[in-house]
Structure formats: structure tokens, C-alpha cells
UniProtKB/Swiss-Prot annotation:
The protein's name: Small ribosomal subunit biogenesis GTPase RsgA
Cofactor: record remark: Binds 1 zinc ion per subunit.
SUPFAM superfamilies: P-loop containing nucleoside triphosphate hydrolases (SSF52540)
Gene that produces this protein: rsgA
MF annotations from Gene Ontology: GTP binding; GTPase activity; metal ion binding; rRNA binding
Gene Ontology cellular-component annotations: cytoplasm
Gene3D superfamilies (alphabetical): Nucleic acid-binding proteins (2.40.50.140), P-loop containing nucleotide triphosphate hydrolases (3.40.50.300), Probable gtpase engc, domain 3 (1.10.40.50)
Organism the protein comes from: Photorhabdus laumondii subsp. laumondii (strain DSM 15139 / CIP 105565 / TT01) (Photorhabdus luminescens subsp. laumondii)
Compositional bias segments (type: Basic and acidic residues): 13-31
GO biological process: ribosomal small subunit biogenesis
Length: 351
């Protein structure tokens, strides 16, 4: 059934009601200083509207209000919070977040209408999970790598389900993955079913905050259920996010989980995909790390690296210095960006 478009009058009333709700929220009194204990360090485990779950220094999780002066708060933020000395009658709140430490990185999601939204903070690495089944898509891997380069977050390419490969197929996969290894990316081949490669993955996760990304069906849930404690496995059966946008998600808030052997993972269902359509063509070009040595070497400054004469990138492809399929995926990404025009112009201030 088609949805009726709201009239201008209905749209105005929706906006007015929204503003009234915001004003009502703003009029709610915050906790007085005499109701609060001493400042403590904490880690945001999850964010729910005007509240956040904060992990205290003793390992306990405390539901906290958020100071109105805090402009942005997301899962993974390191904060200063103060415990409540009194319990509010209407909401079980144990404290208030007073300040947010400077972030080392921020994972953002481009929104078609509202600009760039922060989803998680202080991410150390993004694990790009792929598999030979349902399909080994190098185009999707390359899209994730461009996103990682733009965000400044280190990627780790993980090829799952290698137990399904025979000797000949393994040789073929090794040749494909060598392309990424040769340009400086970490590549790990494993099987969450047989356990092959899992010990090495555990070591690479230790001491770091990680996001798992990958198209539907590559085994992200199986990997996380193998890595996480049993009491958190059931949570992730339905909660693990599909960052590729090719599958469904059921959770509404990002959440941080601890690996028993060290390190953390943030499940971010708010990110269906690493949308690239908000990037400039120059940012996408810079996202292909092996291109960088050749940029500026083209005959024309506005070279599109297609049929332009004396193109340094195309010459590098012809000389086998740049992988042909990576070069083709680069143009596929640019072509896909031209098909989507956001309602909002993106600026650095959006993040």
C-alpha cells in the first residue's frame, strides 16, 4: 500500500510537535552537584537516546544521563562520569556523563538527508570479513578498503570458510589475496567451523577495539559467537550487524562487547553499509593506496583515468604495476557514486 505524502500543513504540525517535545525534554532538571559523587573514568558501552550505559572502572555497567552540553556521544567514547547519590523516581539512572575525552577515531555513517552521523568512537581496526561462498566479491572488499582509508582506521581482510576449498581452489584464492598483501594490507584466511586461523585472529584482536564488516552470509555471526563468551553469544545471534547493507539487522543501538582473550568489538547495526557517495572522486582515488605513487604523473591535471591520453594510472595498469581488477573496481565505485545524489551537501563539520 502506497504511503500518502504529507501536506505542507501536516509537515508543519509534525515539526511543531517535535520542537515541543524537545523543549519539554530541555526543561527537565539535570542532577545537582550535591546529588553526585566524585568524577570517574568510564567507557560508553551503548547509547539510548538521552541515556548511556557506561562501564565504570570496577567493571560494572551504569545507566547515566548525558549533560546537555555534550554535543556528541557514541559507543566507544571514553568519558568522565559521576555516580548519583540518589535514585530518580521515574528513571533508574545511576549517574551522569560529564565530559568526553578526545577521540582517536570515529566511525561515521553518511545519511541521505542529514549528513554524516557518528556511530562509534575510538575504533582501532575494521575486520572486513569475506568468504568464497556465497561469493568472493573483490568489489565489496575494495569499497570497504576505501572507507577504511578515508576514516583513517586500519583494515584487516579476513577470508572465512576456507575449509570449503580444495587444494586447487586454495591456490586460486591465495593468488587473489596476494594482491592485497602486496600493497600492504593484512590478510588472514580462516574457518570459524574448523578453528583454522582462529588463534591468529584472537591475537590480532587483543588490546584493540574492532568493528566487523562484510556482506550477508560470510559468517560474521559465527566468528563472533566463537570469539565471545557463552553468555553473550545469544545476544549476538540476532544482534550482529550487517555493515554491508546486503542483509537485515534487528538491533537499534550500537553496543560494545569484551573478548575473553583481550580486545573489544562494537556491534553497530546503525551502519548498514560504508556508503561512499558522500565522498569526492579525489577521496576515492586516494583510497586506493597503490595509486598514490602515480597521482600527479598524468599529462592533464583533470585526468579522469579513463581514455585520457598519457594517463599515469592506466600506464601502470598496462605495466602490471597496478592490479587490473582493482583499477576496474575503482571506476565501478565512481560510477555508482554518480547514480546517487544526496539531499545534503557534506562538509567536514558534519562529522
Amino acid at each position: 500500500m502506497a504511503k500518502h505524502k504529507l501536506s505542507k500543513g501536516q509537515q508543519r504540525r509534525v515539526r511543531e510537535n517535535h520542537q515541543r517535545r524537545l523543549k519539554k525534554q530541555d526543561n527537565k532538571p539535570e542532577m545537582d552537584d550535591n546529588q553526585l559523587g566524585e568524577p570517574q573514568e568510564g567507557l560508553v558501552i551503548s547509547r539510548f537516546g538521552q541515556h548511556a550505559d557506561v562501564e565504570a572502572e570496577d567493571g560494572s555497567t551504569q545507566r547515566c544521563n548525558i549533560r546537555r552540553t555534550i554535543r556528541s556521544l557514541v559507543t566507544g567514547d571514553r568519558v568522565v562520569w559521576r555516580p548519583s547519590l540518589q535514585t530518580q523516581a521515574d528513571v533508574k539512572v545511576n549517574g551522569i556523563v560529564e565530559a568526553v575525552h578526545e577521540r582517536t577515531s570515529v566511525l561515521t555513517r553518511p545519511d541521505y538527508y542529514d549528513g554524516i552521523k557518528p556511530i562509534a568512537a575510538n575504533i582501532d581496526q575494521i575486520v572486513i570479513v569475506s568468504a568464497i561462498l556465497p561469493e568472493l566479491s573483490l568489489n565489496i572488499i575494495d569499497r570497504y578498503l576505501v572507507a577504511c582509508e578515508t576514516l583513517g582506521i586500519e583494515p584487516l581482510i579476513v577470508l572465512n570458510k576456507i575449509d570449503l576449498l580444495d587444494e586447487e581452489s586454495r591456490a586460486w584464492v591465495n593468488e587473489i589475496m596476494s594482491t592485497y598483501h602486496n600493497i600492504g594490507y593484512r590478510v588472514l584466511k580462516l574457518s570459524s567451523h574448523t578453528g583454522e586461523g582462529m588463534e591468529e585472529l584472537t591475537k590480532m584482536l587483543a588490546g584493540r577495539i574492532t568493528i566487523f564488516a562484510g556482506q550477508s552470509g560470510v559468517g560474521k555471526s559465527s566468528l563472533l559467537n566463537t570469539l565471545l563468551p557463552e553468555d553473550e553469544e545469544e545476544i549476538l545471534v540476532n544482534q550482529v550487524s550487517d555493515v554491508s547493507g546486503l542483509g537485515q539487522h534487528t538491533t537499534t543501538a550500537s553496543r560494545l562487547y569484551h573478548f575473553p582473550h583481550g580486545g573489544d568489538v562494537i556491534d553497530s547495526p546503525g551502519v548498514r553499509e560504508f556508503g561512499l557517495w558522500h565522498l569526492t572522486s579525489e577521496q576515492v582515488t586516494q583510497g586506493f593506496v597503490e595509486f598514490r605513487d602515480y597521482l600527479g604523473g598524468c599529462k592533464f591535471r583533470d585526468c579522469k583515468h579513463r581514455d585520457d591520453p598519457a594517463c599515469a594510472l592506466r600506464k601502470a595498469v598496462e605495466d602490471n604495476e597496478i592490479n587490473q581488477e582493482r583499477f576496474e573496481n575503482y571506476h565501478r565505485i565512481l560510477d555508482s557514486m554518480d547514480q546517487i545524489k544526496p539531499r545534503k551537501t557534506f562538509t567536514d563539520n558534519d562529522s
